[in-house]
Amino acid sequence: MSSSLWLQCLQRLQEELPSAEFSMWVRPLQAELNDNTLTLFAPNRFVLDWVRDKYLNSINSLLNEFCGGDIPTLRFEVGSKPISAPPRPQRTAADVAAATSAPAQMQARQSLHKPWESRGPEPVDDLNHRSNVNPKHKFTNFVEGKSNQLGLAAARQVSDNPGTAYNPLFLYGGTGLGKTHLLQAVGNAILERKPNAKVVYMHSERFVQDMVKALQNNAIEEFKCYYRSVDALLIDDIQFFANKERSQEEFFHTFNALLEGNQQIILTSDRYPKEINGVEDRLKSRFGWGLTVAIEPPELETRVAILMKKAEDHQIHLADEVAFFIAKRLRSNVRELEGALNRVVANANFTGRAITIDFVREALRDLLALQEKLVTIDNIQKTVAEYYKIKMADLLSKRRSRSVARPRQLAMALSKELTNHSLPEIGDAFGGRDHTTVLHACRKIAQLREESHDIKEDYSNLIRTLSS
């Protein structure tokens, strides 16, 4: 009874939730039904709290639908069911194909439950153990928002359960969005709990350089020994492996060895794994074996929170209206925000003036002028039309077909977010539409970004293109 009931719930939740969200929070749950009480077992307290906070109503609603009036009491526990493994939703044809294409060793690896601990032997010669983890990058000073919430949660889970939670963890997104911060925060969290752990952070180019040096020195076995003995390997900008065939070959075998040993791998890239050109398909396939999470450009509230946090680090007072002024005009990434604030703070220190909106406008005049020049309604319209492969004339027309109406709504929402034009001005630019039409479009897109993974992804891609 418990298996079939929870299986029904799983199948429905899998249909309703984005795949990454389902894989991270719902799939790990195990279920047991005793005396009309359905107990859901979560792997740790973090998952338990998240599921109870985010999905309790949905689960109760499904139980009501599937059980009629005889609804079991729902309770949560940290741990695992004492008997068989949790039920899984029925696999699709794509799932089966992916599973059968994976090598047998991957299936064997998934059945291993080795304790996570430091592995020897010690590295030799100039491949001395170096973590390279920046101690300043921690979870405590990472500003959370909707744009990075899933990535932060995944990183925390990996740091709590390295080698078992999500392996590999693949974070992707544009420059300056916090991927490196999260990567190193995991490393710091692991080292805080296990100071002797072999945690190695590096840019992908360093892996290539180490391999080349090992080949030159006839020390490739030492190179393999070093990289395959780490407890956690954190590699930034994996896209730089593109077209480096020997490096990809060596990393392929290192990757397999680490996964078989339940050693944690975390990778970052500026794009989705399958979109990385010049990297072998077998590697791209493995990048997706664990959990793949997008880190998106921060929304307005998160940008403001980042500015306030950085101002606090500088020990200066930043008025709310000043933070909003900067955040509304600089939207592309966190690094740009930090650079702008650093310039404002430096100017204030040099001149002794108070940080007001007028002062910020003066200190950042070239940067703000460039942003206003780059992001115009016309530019947004052209970018959206090109992205969806429709004609500009159709985008501005009265046509209501879905293939045109949705891109038009997206373009209106982007115009509202990325420019300082009023709703009537935006409506005017879209064929003389009323401001209420623009308002409806903005609300509709905001709703769809919550409900549709595709719309959310398209919106993020367009923001990235327009802000680059």
Swiss-Prot record:
One Pfam family hit: Bac_DnaA_C
Basic and acidic residues: compositionally biased ranges: 114-129
Start and end residues of each stretch annotated as Domain III, AAA+ region: 132-348
Chain intervals for the UniProt region annotation (Disordered): 112-132
Location in the cell: Cytoplasm
UniProt-listed GO biological process terms: DNA replication initiation; regulation of DNA replication
Name by which UniProt lists this protein: Chromosomal replication initiator protein DnaA
Natural source organism: Aliivibrio salmonicida (strain LFI1238)
